[in-house]
């Protein structure tokens, strides 16, 4: 007769959870940030709000975003005028859209990740799906399983309404799944579509206008597993540790509420200041066990939020400008894609490292950090270990 401890030992993987493949996808519709204010005020029938339009132009100009991708085309918005009003009942139309499009965009990214991984999809044991765009039962995890033709016995976890920190959350959850289930291969998908948050401008709610200037659509997928099969699976990054915390004195700093008018978004406090003031504590807790205290010795992947957050974090920690290159690049090319952002940045970093011929996937460095920030204010901190290229 075996003991419970013997069973547990046999169930556990030996090595750390490892990212084995990354895939990304966006809708085809690309919008240039320089042209967006004119388009946005025209499509929402708000061109008479000239002062507000000038304010929005300044927001877009300071955003450091060059372009974004959006499922919502001009044709779709003309067919759904309530989406263009500031607070018209429109939840049904938004839901009808996203419950179909979120899994579809997730499938695109997942298909790319599975192709890079190179193993049969029947080897996928777990699915972790994350979106802040809409809610449904059965969820986007179920729809993705059907779209990809995964085994009906695949173990699914659906994460709705987490917000911008959740790119870190999915890594933390996948790490625990991979390390506690020997042979597990976890498909992680973050898929976000702004159809739930798009609305016309309003003079008294500038935080809603900030969201219109920053958010874009995108989906990213990873394959995560421990103990990669030599010569068959190719490690990209190892997940060494993961933590989550709520920042002090940050209640109500970022709020999102699902209402008849869609998902409303509120920024109520100095979010960049709160994050930059508290970030070092998370770094110290994560890296003290490794004996690391030089933040410039790490490679950096951080949820971009907006340029003010990046500027204040960079200043507070004394980071060299090149530390946030990959993060700023993704913000510029895609905008803020909520939970998917940090996974896009992982992909950008490993791609650029291979292109430049540096010795590791982490810009030639061994250790790195991934940060997710979002409602709460909640911070996810993931310690990464690069692999040789």
Curated annotation (Swiss-Prot):
Keyword Transferase: yes
Tissue expression from the record: Highly expressed in glandular trichomes (lupulin glands) of maturating cones, to a lower extent, in petioles, flowers and stem apexes of flowering plants, and, at low levels, in roots and leaf blades.
Catalytic reactions of this protein: (E)-4-coumaroyl-CoA + 3 malonyl-CoA + 3 H(+) = 2',4,4',6'-tetrahydroxychalcone + 3 CO2 + 4 CoA; 3-methylbutanoyl-CoA + 3 malonyl-CoA + 3 H(+) = phlorisovalerophenone + 3 CO2 + 4 CoA
Residues annotated as signal peptide: none
Single GO molecular function: phloroisovalerophenone synthase activity
Ways its activity is controlled: Stimulated by CHIL2 but inhibited by CHIL1.
Biological or metabolic pathway of the protein: Secondary metabolite biosynthesis; flavonoid biosynthesis
Upregulating conditions: Accumulates in leaves in response to UV-A.
EC number: 2.3.1.74, 2.3.1.156
Active-site positions on this chain: 164
Gene3D superfamilies tied to this protein: 3.40.47.10
UniProt keyword terms in alphabetical order: Acyltransferase, Cytoplasm, Flavonoid biosynthesis, Transferase
Enzyme class: transferase
Pfam family, one: Chal_sti_synt_N
Keyword Protein transport: no
GO cellular component, one term: cytoplasm
Function: Involved in the biosynthesis of prenylated phenolics natural products which contribute to the bitter taste of beer and display broad biological activities. Chalcone synthase that can use 4-coumaroyl-CoA to produce 4,2',4',6'-tetrahydroxychalcone (also termed naringenin-chalcone or chalcone) which can, under specific conditions, spontaneously isomerize into naringenin. Also able to produce phlorisovalerophenone (PIVP) from 3-methylbutanoyl-CoA (isovaleryl-CoA).
The protein's name: Chalcone synthase H1
Organism: Humulus lupulus
Gene (UniProt): chs_H1
């Amino acid at each position: 007769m075996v003991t419970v401890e013997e069973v547990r030992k046999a169930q556990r993987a030996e090595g750390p959870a490892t990212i084995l493949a990354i895939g990304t996808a966006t809708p085809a519709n690309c919008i240039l940030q320089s042209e967006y204010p004119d388009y946005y005020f025209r499509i929402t029938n708000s061109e008479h709000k000239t002062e507000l339009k000038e304010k929005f132009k300044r927001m877009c100009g300071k955003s450091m975003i060059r372009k974004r991708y959006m499922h919502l085309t001009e044709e779709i918005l003309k067919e759904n005028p309530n989406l263009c009003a500031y607070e018209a009942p429109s939840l049904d139309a938004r839901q009808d859209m996203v419950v179909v499009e979120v899994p579809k965009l997730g499938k695109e990214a997942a298909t790319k990740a599975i192709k890079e991984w190179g193993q049969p999809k029947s080897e996928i044991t777990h699915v972790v799906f994350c979106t802040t765009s809409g809610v449904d039962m059965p969820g986007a995890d179920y729809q993705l399983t059907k779209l990809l033709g995964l085994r009906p016995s695949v173990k699914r976890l659906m994460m709705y309404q987490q917000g911008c920190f959740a790119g870190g959350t999915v890594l933390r959850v996948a790490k625990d799944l991979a390390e506690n289930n020997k042979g597990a291969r976890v498909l992680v998908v973050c898929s976000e579509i702004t159809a739930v948050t798009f609305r016309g401008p309003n003079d008294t709610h500038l935080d809603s206008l900030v969201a219109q200037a920053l958010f874009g659509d995108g989906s990213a997928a990873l394959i995560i597993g421990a103990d990669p099969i030599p010569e068959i699976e190719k490690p990209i990054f190892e997940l060494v540790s993961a933590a989550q915390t709520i920042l002090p004195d940050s209640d109500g700093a970022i709020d999102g509420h699902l209402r008849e008018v869609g998902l409303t978004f509120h920024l109520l406090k100095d979010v960049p200041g709160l994050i930059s003031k508290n970030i070092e504590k998370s770094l110290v807790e994560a890296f003290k066990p490794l004996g690391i205290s030089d933040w410039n010795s790490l490679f950096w992947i951080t949820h971009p939020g907006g340029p003010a957050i990046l500027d204040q974090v960079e200043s507070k920690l004394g980071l060299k400008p090149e530390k946030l290159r990959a993060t700023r690049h993704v913000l510029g090319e895609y905008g803020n894609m909520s939970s998917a952002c940090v996974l896009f940045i992982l992909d950008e970093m490993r791609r650029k490292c291979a292109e430049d011929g540096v010795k590791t996937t982490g810009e030639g460095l061994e250790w790195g950090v991934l940060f997710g920030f979002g409602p709460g204010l909640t911070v996810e901190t993931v310690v990464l270990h690069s692999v040789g290229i």
